[in-house]
Structure formats: structure tokens, C-alpha cells
């Protein structure tokens, strides 16, 4: 993967909790704390899936995760974005957080519905369609596919 290659040659990745950034692959959030993280959340709002779904589909095909593990990670991570990243992004582009949400929600796809608690929920998420083990430890899976660790292992076993 390009991320592993770049890390082997000195790229430093974000140091963040995946629950805050909504992405299990740290090499996706490089240039700043706001652009990539907020973009992934906006993708989720508009299309109903974010970078977690996209990246894990590749990981499934490469045999790095099982479909069941991917479903658990998608359920827990896809679309997550800590409010501080949204606030930083709004400051960066000089709008209010309310303006941000007005625009973001205007692009929300029809796969969403507003529940009785006024929380947006996917109408038919994969974790309600396919049985899976909801007790999977997402941090164990994230650690196993962490591109920083993979890059370190590859650099120890092969010359640059």
C-alpha cells in the first residue's frame, strides 16, 4: 500500500484515537487535523459510507480482516469525527459550526432518517443485514492493520 511505502521512507502519521477520527488507517490523515478527517465524515453523510467502509473493503480482499471484523469496525467508526476537528475546520474556512451543519445536512443522502431523538441514523446499515460478532475488539483489529506497524515490520525484513 502507498501508506506503508511512505511511512517506510519517513512519513509521520496522525496520533489520534480512531474513535475520534472515524478511520482505522492513520496514514489517511496526514496534512492536518481537519481536512481528511472532516472529508471522511462528509463522505459518510452524503453517500452513506465513509473511508472506513472503503478501506476495509480493500483489507477484506487482501485477507487482512474478515468481513465480520470489517462490519464491526464500520459500525463503530464510519462517519465519526470528534467535534474539535469540525470546529478547527470551521475556523480554517471561516464559517460557524451551525453554518457547517446546515450545508453538510443539505447534502445528506436519502439513506438516512431522523429518529425520534433527532439523531440521524442509516435506514438499513450492514450490521442490521448480516449477522456478525458485536464483541470483536476493534482496537485489536486496528492494531493488526495499522500501517505504521506494518511499515516497521516490512523495514525490518527487507532493505529499503
Residues covered by each model-derived region:
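Nucleotide-activated chemistry modules centered on ATP-dependent adenylation/adenylyltransferase
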Residues: 1-160
Amino acid at each position: 500500500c502507498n501508506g506503508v511505502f511512505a511511512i517506510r521512507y519517513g512519513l509521520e502519521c496522525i496520533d489520534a484515537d480512531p474513535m475520534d477520527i472515524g478511520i482505522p488507517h492513520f496514514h489517511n490523515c496526514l496534512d492536518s487535523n481537519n481536512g481528511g478527517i472532516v472529508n471522511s465524515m462528509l463522505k459518510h453523510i452524503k453517500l452513506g459510507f465513509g473511508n472506513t467502509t472503503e478501506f476495509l473493503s480493500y483489507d477484506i480482499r487482501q485477507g487482512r480482516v474478515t468481513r465480520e471484523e470489517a462490519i464491526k469496525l464500520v459500525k463503530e467508526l464510519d462517519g465519526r469525527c470528534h467535534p474539535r476537528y469540525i470546529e478547527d475546520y470551521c475556523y480554517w474556512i471561516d464559517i460557524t459550526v451551525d453554518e457547517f451543519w446546515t450545508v453538510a445536512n443539505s447534502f445528506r443522502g436519502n439513506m438516512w432518517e431522523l429518529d425520534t431523538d433527532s439523531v440521524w441514523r442509516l435506514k438499513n446499515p450492514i450490521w442490521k443485514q448480516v449477522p456478525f460478532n458485536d464483541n470483536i475488539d476493534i482496537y485489536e483489529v486496528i492494531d493488526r492493520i495499522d500501517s505504521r506497524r506494518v511499515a516497521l515490520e516490512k523495514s525490518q525484513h527487507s532493505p529499503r
